[in-house]
Amino acid sequence: MKHYRPILAAAILSAAIGFHTNDSYAQNYGYPEGKNAADLIREDTLRTGNNHHIYEYVDLHDTRAPKGYKAFYISHYGRHGSRTDHRGNEAWVVLEKELRPAYEAGILSWKGRQAYEKIVEMCEVGDGMREMLTPVGVREHKEIAGRMYRRFREVFRQSKEVEARSSTVQRCVLSMGAFCTALAAEDPKLDIDLLTGQRYMDYIAHTTGYGEATAGSDKMLKAYKKAHPRDTVSFFALMFNDPAEGRAFIKDAYHFESNLIDCANYCQCLGVEDVFHRCMPFEVYYDAWSLKNRSLYLVHCNSAEFGDKRIPIGKPLVDDIIAKADAAVAGNGRAADLRFGHDYPLMALTGYLDLQGVGGRYSFDEIDDKWFGSWNICMASNLQLVFYRNRSGDVLVKCLYNERETLINGLEPFYGPYYRWDELRKYWMERF
């Protein structure tokens, strides 16, 4: 696909010309005007990936801070970058074994042959790398770190101390390493303290109890799945020269197609070209996206059905953010607190902080129209809280989600996307 190169080009261009600074308010985090999820997926079929979608960097702007305010501290939480599958029996391994006899028999169509050859490539790239960060994931975090440094240079001019903490899971530790390596490349004088350990999991990756909090979600998702039966016939005509002959090689059409969808979603994380979407009708992979999109939001975000019970589970992470921000405001001399974790805690965090769009409260029927998982919880998704102070000691905070200025639903800003820290702190501490 034409996917990562334009993103990389955009990052290089932004680094070359600098970030746009104007007096605009925060960027709209919903769907572009006049477009919906189907439109976005037709533009780029890899957007069916949801939380397996690679990071999309878009050109952005910075609203000027009020006169006299200078950035002095950043509080950050980042999901690990692109990874291989975390389950056993990866889809591409299963499909390679299943399709090899048909490939050797010469009954695959040109689309089917292309798919098989890319499946073989995925097996080679992913061999011995289950659950691991990929080179794409390393690149994502290095680029995010570089942009953060160049965007807020004044933070790191005032202080060189950076604390980084990670989930104990390898892909998070390596994401932390990639991010901090890029920061050090920007400024070798930075004093970066990196650690991981079980003690940090209590807030970085705290999801205990979410199953009980969202009891009933399975029933809703099963009903939705039943109401949207999948076409498991059309792919035979696309992948085989003779669909009837192809059926003899496929034992379970539904599971075969499910594995094909997994390959379509994961190939981008492994840096393998996508040829899989062309082997399925649009409706098949769109409906698969919709089911996963609804599942992610319903179980881990601020849903109307379960949000009041699910979101408070993220309180330890919010407490850590507030405590470390208070210390920075009090003058502990730290430039940034960095945290590297997972998608589920980050989704709950956006709901707890009440971030506009990504953390909004929607009912099950609204999810696909309001919340696009492929943007909202893609690989390397991140939150950056940037703190500003004037000579009088007044502190403002700007929230960036995936590097874009983002508003708080339930709180009036001081100006543009800037909030008074004392008001924002109080709002977050009193939620739930």
Residue positions per predicted region:
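Bacterial Sec-dependent N-terminal signal peptides
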Residues: M1-N28
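Signature for phosphate-centric chemistry
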Residues: Q27-E163, S167-D337, G341-F432
